[in-house]
């Protein structure tokens, strides 16, 4: 152990004594809980920095300075110790490492590989924390959070750069990820797709105007194709039970009997890309293939009535039953109801319930005939007739995908709530904040990491990413995980798993947050 390491150890012991005095000294007897908690947090961060610095110093101490052999058989002599900075959650720390060199061959730093350091200075933990914040918050807000909680200054440029680098392995991660165990899957395999516009920065114009003209915008939108695949258990419903749920009417006795708890998607995977419909659906088909098999009894493809998307869904998933998202179909009924009765008419809801029941009962052909006849009746205003004709035409074109009575009887989903929620939460809530403009590459990187987070793959992906990076940088396997981290985790887990652990320490368990509002909070069990 060098004198530097010994000095750091002495400083750590002094700081620990200060910590004890901070919570038990005379001043602590007059302090508030808030003062002690805040002070402890800052002092523990400082102590963590010293402990991590000691770790680096001791690893450098034990690192041999004897000449090393390269993979090619060349010998490199010890040249000097060289410093690199390490930006950790505790702040900026120096790492001194022995550097080995031979003229004409270059140099190597074995300690970098042993510590599994990346190419830049940011620690993996700091990267993962900032990126996890970044996939849900604007980048400058992420920087504010890091500054407020950890006292760190991480620029938006650094956050964006780290996300771009760490998103590079997402595609290869999902390519190697095994399909779920069939025993954990349900019998209905469901695919969904929809598009959502993302505001992009324009290509640099030769002479940007000082003031925009009427109707001009500073950016343009490009469609992000959002896809999802999951399995779900069959849930038989009646048209009436769906109407009762959708319009929050008092359910009939038969409807109550046929209203079990809602089935939930199993192993849902979502994805979004600006590479186009074909690229998105090709990838979706690749995801679907290993999940299909004898355990799957039904295959369902859900999307809205956008004809180009429907054609592609039929092309890429020919063995799936294409279903028009019922919510989209019902929106056309709402437009007719508003045109005929007005938004404030007391009978509008009753009219909607009546025609919704007809649609769900697979009587859409009758609805089409009624609307077409009304569209020719001159007693209705021109705008009313136009809306009737528009809806009749929409239903006529989508009639092959609107056999809802059969779908409900088989227990199939009839609404693309998963993908609608993904478009809103996954894309819009992050990419369409006020004044936000993206480069295509920047938003692709964000959406990749956001998919990893939303799919519940965050920790597993970053382990994969670190292994891939290590092979690229050092051409060797990632170091085996030492028991240190596992020991810390197990010690913490063993404390948490004891039923009396919290109560014996006078602690109440922290309540889990509620599920995010989304598909499962829809009034319609679809």
Predicted regions and their residues:
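Catalytic center-proximal scaffold of phosphoryl-transfer enzymes
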Residues: 1-57, 97-526
């Amino acid at each position: 152990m060098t004198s530097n390491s010994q000095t750091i150890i002495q400083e750590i012991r002094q700081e620990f004594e200060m910590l004890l005095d901070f919570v038990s000294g005379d001043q602590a007897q007059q302090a508030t809980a808030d003062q002690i908690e805040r002070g402890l947090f800052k002092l523990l961060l400082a102590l963590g920095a010293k402990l991590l610095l000691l770790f680096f110093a001791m690893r450098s101490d034990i690192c041999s300075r004897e000449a090393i052999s390269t993979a090619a058989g060349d010998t490199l002599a010890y040249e000097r110790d060289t410093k690199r900075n390490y930006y950790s959650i505790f702040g900026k720390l120096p790492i001194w490492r022995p550097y080995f060199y031979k003229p004409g061959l270059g140099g190597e730093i074995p300690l970098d590989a042993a510590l599994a350091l990346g190419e830049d200075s940011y620690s993996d933990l700091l990267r993962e924390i900032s990126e996890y914040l970044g996939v849900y918050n604007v980048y400058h807000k992420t920087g504010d959070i890091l500054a407020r909680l950890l006292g760190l200054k991480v620029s938006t440029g650094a956050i964006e750069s780290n996300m771009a680098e760490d998103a590079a392995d997402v595609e290869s991660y999902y390519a190697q990820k095994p399909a779920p165990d069939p025993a954990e899957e349900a019998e209905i395999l469901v695919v969904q797709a929809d598009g959502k516009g993302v505001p992009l920065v324009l290509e640099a114009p030769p002479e940007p105007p000082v003031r925009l003209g009427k109707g001009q915008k500073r950016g343009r939108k490009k469609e992000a194709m959002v896809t999802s695949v999951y399995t779900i258990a069959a849930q038989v419903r009646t048209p009436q039970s769906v109407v009762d749920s959708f319009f929050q009417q008092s359910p009939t006795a038969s409807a109550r009997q046929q209203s079990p708890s809602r089935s939930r998607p199993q192993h849902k995977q979502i994805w979004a890309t600006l590479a186009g419909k074909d690229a998105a659906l090709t990838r979706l088909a690749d995801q679907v293939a290993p999940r299909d098999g004898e355990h799957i009894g039904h295959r369902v493809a859900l999307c809205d009535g956008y004809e180009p998307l429907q054609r592609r869904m039929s092309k890429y998933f020919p063995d799936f039953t294409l279903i028009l998202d019922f919510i989209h179909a019902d929106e056309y009924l709402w437009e007719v109801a508003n045109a005929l009765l007005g938004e404030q008419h007391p009978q509008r809801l009753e009219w909607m319930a009546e025609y919704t029941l007809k649609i769900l009962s697979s009587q859409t052909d009758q609805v089409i005939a009624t609307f077409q006849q009304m569209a020719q009746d001159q007693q209705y205003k021109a705008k009313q007739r136009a809306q009737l004709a528009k809806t009749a035409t929409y239903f006529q074109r989508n009639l092959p995908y609107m056999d809802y009575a059969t779908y409900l009887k088989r227990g199939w989903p009839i609404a693309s709530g998963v993908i609608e929620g993904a478009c809103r939460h996954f894309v819009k809530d992050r990419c369409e904040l006020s004044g936000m403009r993206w480069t295509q590459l920047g938003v692709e990187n964000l959406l990749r990491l956001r998919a990893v987070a939303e799919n519940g793959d965050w920790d597993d992906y970053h382990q994969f990413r670190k292994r891939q990076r290590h092979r690229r940088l050092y051409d060797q396997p990632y170091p085996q995980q030492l028991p240190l981290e596992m020991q810390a985790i197990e010690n913490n887990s063993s404390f948490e798993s004891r039923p009396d652990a919290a109560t014996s320490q006078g602690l109440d368990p922290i309540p889990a947050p509620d599920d995010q509002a989304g598909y499962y909070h829809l009034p319609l069990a679809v």
